[in-house]
Design a protein with these regions (language model features):
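Hydrophobic helix-and-loop "lid/oligomerization" segment in the mid-to-C-terminal part
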Residues: 4, 9-138, 143-179
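Acidic/histidine metal-binding catalytic segments
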Residues: 1
Length: 179
């Protein structure tokens, strides 16, 4: 069950380009052991507390789009997170909703964590825009080409302003309509 769940989540439910024939072969072998793929999927994706769904709705209402750069971002302050009884994991996957918007190739979520006095940043892309390099160059973070993370010790507003200012250095690769 755990292996299936890990492969399913890491491949975006098998939609990411990194999903290969071998991925499906491994999954086929796991299914032969009698695990229920629908039970695992339901446990992970259809098992949200009501506050998490409310947080998702709120976060999506705050999405900002930078149309000329095919970029969007969401910011959530600690106060906003607390309003929805935030628990670790509640924001998992929210950043991916930005990539479902037509022509968006770069999506970011900024989350204030006042306990650690940092801003947690999750970056996602589709196509040829390398968020690993962006994350590394701008915030000292890392990950891989289409998914990365970072931490900022600046305030939420200063982190977002730094991000927005940094986008100008990536204008050409972001403006490209090639996704």
């Amino acid at each position: 069950r755990s292996l299936y769940a890990g492969i399913m989540t890491d491949t975006g439910s098998f939609k990411f380009p990194s999903t290969t024939e071998l991925t499906h072969l491994v999954i086929s072998n796991l299914l032969k052991t009698g695990i229920s793929h629908s039970d695992i999927h339901n446990h992970i994706y259809d098992n949200n507390k009501f506050e998490r769904v409310q947080l998702l709705s709120f976060a999506l209402s705050k999405i900002k789009i930078i149309e000329n750069l095919n970029t969007c971002y969401i910011s959530l302050s600690q106060k906003e997170l607390n309003k929805f009884n935030y628990e670790k994991g509640d924001t998992e996957g929210i950043v991916n909703y930005g990539l479902s918007i037509k022509n968006i190739k770069f999506a970011v979520i900024f989350m204030e964590n006042s306990n650690d006095n940092v801003i947690r940043i999750s970056l996602r892309s589709r196509g040829d825009f390398d968020v690993n390099q962006f994350s590394k160059n701008i915030f000292g973070g890392g990950g891989h080409k289409n998914a990365a993370g970072a931490i900022s010790k600046k305030s939420l507003d200063n982190t977002i302003n730094y991000f927005l200012d940094s986008l100008k250095n990536y204008k050409e690769s972001l403006k490209s309509k090639h996704i």
